């Protein structure tokens, strides 16, 4: 994942001796006051709204959970992350308080429109993604870097269910281009864990599952709170 994605969607806060508070908060039903951007807005197409409603139905029996998504990390969460993982000489609290998550930094409809759903039993994350007009690469199609980003954060969420992680490796095979404003399904699953290494697979398919746009594998490393990142 991109370095900023290590904190994406998460109310970060971890205590070294137990399950990271960030993970507990994200995958629980704890109320938060930040605006949740993983909810329908006027830019969502009919296809995206339909898929969203279908997955919300799946959430009713508790097998799936919709994950929230925020533009900024709460100040307390940011401070806790920096305390455990950032060397004090590199902390820039005033600047960091103004930082925004990359995937939520564009106006609605222009960039990354998506919602994620988590299945704990299957160790799986499904992301419903609509690429906006400001994500263009070749005319009419989503940029490969934007595709890599949505894979990174979706696969990263699978790994994040096991603790606070960052990307070590991302291997992507681009099969078919994704048209702008189309809706695709990003499906990621945690395959295995070896110590601090977490291996995740990911695919992007059309909503009818007839077109495979992308295949990917990713390796994430669980962060050690005793070893600062900087």
UniProtKB/Swiss-Prot annotation:
Substrate binds at residues 175, 196-197. The modification N6-acetyllysine is found at residue 65. The active site is at residue 152. The modification N6-succinyllysine is found at residues 46, 57, 89, 98, 197. The modification Phosphoserine is found at residues 28-29. The keyword Zinc does not apply. Keywords: Acetylation, Apoptosis, Cell membrane, Cell projection, Cytoplasm, Fatty acid metabolism, Hydrolase, Lipid metabolism, Membrane, Mitochondrion, Mitochondrion inner membrane, Phosphoprotein, Transit peptide. The keyword Transit peptide applies. Its EC number is 3.1.2.2. GO terms for cellular component: cytosol; mitochondrial inner membrane; mitochondrial intermembrane space; mitochondrion; ruffle membrane. Residues 1-27 form a transit peptide. It is a peripheral membrane protein. Its main location: membrane. Gene3D superfamilies: Hotdog Thioesterase. It is an enzyme of class 3 (hydrolase). GO terms for biological process: fatty acid metabolic process; negative regulation of phosphatidylinositol 3-kinase/protein kinase B signal transduction; regulation of mitochondrial membrane permeability involved in apoptotic process. Transmembrane segments: none annotated. Phosphorylated. InterPro entries: HotDog_dom_sf, THEM4/THEM5_acyl-CoA_thioest, Thioestr_dom. Has acyl-CoA thioesterase activity towards medium and long-chain (C14 to C18) fatty acyl-CoA substrates, and probably plays a role in mitochondrial fatty acid metabolism. Plays a role in the apoptotic process, possibly via its regulation of AKT1 activity. Belongs to the THEM4/THEM5 thioesterase family. This is Acyl-coenzyme A thioesterase THEM4. It comes from Rattus norvegicus. The gene is Them4.
